[in-house]
């Protein structure tokens, strides 16, 4: 959503192509004008508040008339929700279509990664059963990196990068209760993420997260939402599964992992709640988690502190640095934002466990 700007005066003329406007040092297009009014939109990030106008003469022979308003206005940016890319047809259907932002579509996008490691800033997305696709924010193009068939996946699921961004790990919901099939695949940036290799074999799972302090990949399996990690086996010269702890005591359930950017702890989302597992720097291992926000099995939309708050289906989340925490000298400077999937909203959780709704409105 953009903010309208109307400028009133005299002798503006009736040709908007001859009127040039900058707001806060950023150029905006003159949408319309008459002799007494100019209509345009506030451009993005125009926070300085100074407005400059340049009007060319009707015949183009005289020097432009330039004017800068003495009075500055204070523009307060409002958070809004919009569509970056993708659309549906008249019946509300869509499918995976590559192309520019105007024509690209998504069939079943579920997981999202911000790729800040490459030369160009991109988003990496996939949905259950793929494909993995790249959204290039600079060229404004969408391309397919790998389909499920190309990677021999049973059911593509969660993704994460390693600490360098050179390796992309992908969970595979292959549906088996044995360790005969690949659970985590890895894709390399050097190959443009177009070849999937086996990283570790295990039972079916849904999520993975990388611990930067120990350079270890953690992931979940279905049974009790158990957290496993991949460790090197000198006998096989490969990675094998090692159980760390179960998330749930008495249920088999999906669990999704997000490791703190500094490796201090790990959030585990699922079953209507958020668990927190602290990292022990002496043992170099995550500890058995405790309930941090929401309540296991209690589905609702309630903004409230800690376990008195409620989630419908807490799904993928990400840590976001809060500059106010940094200025205040707090030990943890990150808020946690997650998608409350069936609640149709984005929730925010502070380091103290305060739950609020950031965008959308919860529906149960």
Predicted regions and their residues:
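Gly/Pro-rich loop segments of beta-rich domains
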Residues: 74-108, 140-157, 174-175, 191-204, ...
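Residue position within the beta-strands of beta-propeller blades
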Residues: 123-126, 169-171, 218-220, 267-269, ...
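A short loop-to-beta-strand structural motif that recurs across blades of beta-propeller domains
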Residues: 130-134, 180-186, 225-229, 272-275, ...
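Hydrophobic/aromatic beta-strand positions that recur at structurally equivalent sites within the blades
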Residues: 76, 135, 185-190, 210, ...
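Residue-level signature of beta-propeller blades and closely related beta-rich strand-turn architectures
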Residues: 128-129, 173-174, 223, 270-272, ...
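Ser/Thr/Pro-rich low-complexity tracts
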Residues: 1-82, 191-192
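Residue-level detector of Asp-centered blade-edge/turn motifs that repeat once per structural unit
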Residues: 114-120, 161-165, 210-214, 259-263, ...
